[in-house]
Amino acid sequence: AVGYGIIADAHGYQYGTDCGYGLLLSDIRYEISGYGFICNTSGEIIAVVTTEITSKNNSLLGGYRASGVRTLIENLINGRSRSYFGIKGQPINSAAEDNYGIPAGLYVSAVEVGSPAYSAGIQTGDIITRIDAKTIENMSDFMDKLNAADSGDIMAVTVKRKSRDSYKEIVFRVTLGVE
């Protein structure tokens, strides 16, 4: 089936383990079990529809921004497995930096037990600021670095960890697993 509508919200973001994807929500009618694509007026795919997002937002058809899942899809098509790090993270916004003195980077909101990050010593509350020589400011930076690596690769991960009255910089060596 083909439906027409407008993008109702383009500002959402959904975070998962080792990933975060931009969301698009539209006012298009949908079938609860349907999958597909949202295209612009030029016929270009701009989102991959998922019922996971759609069902959470009443009658809004939702999907992951195509730009965010492109590398994942290309890797799957080429038979390349996804490297596994094992964290959930969220970017530190500028208000938190300015008002609370929290360093810029990717805040680790959860670490999966038994994951490469867990085994290396990374903890919930750490702020990832660099991987190897690349500055990490958000989940996109993190995913770019992870998508370019293979399982078994060793990454030098720099975090800032809260101590009594400051943040200490710690470097961990994380050996990536396979998802």
Model-derived features with residue positions:
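Beta-strand/loop subdomains of soluble extracytoplasmic proteins
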Residues: 1-13, 21-22, 67-72, 83, ...
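Soluble non-cytosolic domains of exported or imported proteins
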Residues: 1, 33, 63-67, 119, ...
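Active-site region of chymotrypsin-like
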Residues: 2-62, 102-109
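A short glycine-leucine-enriched loop at secondary-structure breakpoints
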Residues: 35-38, 99-102, 116-127, 148-150
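C-terminal cap/linker of serine protease catalytic domains
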Residues: 45-103, 166-167
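Solvent-exposed coil/turn segments that connect beta secondary-structure elements
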Residues: 8-13, 29-31, 42, 51-53, ...
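PDZ-domain C-terminal substructure recognizer with occasional recognition of PDZ-binding tails
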Residues: 74-84, 88, 94-96, 129-131, ...
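Conserved PDZ fold ligand-binding element
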Residues: 42-46, 117-139
